[in-house]
From Swiss-Prot:
This is Protein C10. It comes from the Eukaryota. Pfam families: P_C10 (PF14974). InterPro entries: P_C10. It comes from Danio rerio. Keywords: Cytoplasm. It is found in: Cytoplasm. Belongs to the UPF0456 family. Its main location: cytoplasm.
């Protein structure tokens, strides 16, 4: 007999704020900050390596926090949490601001080449 699918956790806006705040704080814990820094240094600002090295560490850090709120302890839980946050971003400016902060912790700043330093036109 197949087991029933796990119920997806639901959070109110207030609960989502709390969880998101805890996730952001988790990245400030010295051990986690060191893990992220090591992964970033190993990735050398290469986007492919960032996905291979930084994203898994960031996912683990988030999982440690969100599992206490009913999200599964696999990558799927982080995706469900991200979808929930995305849904609340439009309803709550505080969640929107925290979401931007979280993304800045996860993704490297995009560097664009200075204007005029691209391919020669002649």
């Amino acid at each position: 007999m197949a087991s029933a699918p796990a119920q997806q956790p639901t959070l109110t806006v207030e609960q989502a704020r709390v969880v998101l705040s805890e996730v952001i704080q988790a990245f400030s814990v010295p051990e986690n900050a060191a893990r992220m820094e090591e992964a970033r240094e190993s990735a050398c600002n290469d986007m492919g390596k960032m996905l291979q090295l930084v994203l898994p560490v960031a996912t683990q850090i988030q999982q440690e926090v969100i599992k206490a709120y009913g999200f599964n302890n696999e990558g799927e839980g982080v995706l469900k949490f991200a979808r929930l946050v995305k849904m609340y971003e439009t309803q709550d400016p505080e969640i929107a601001a925290m979401s931007v902060k979280l993304k800045s912790l996860l993704l490297p700043p995009l560097s664009t080449p200075p204007i005029g330093s691209g391919i020669p036109t002649s």
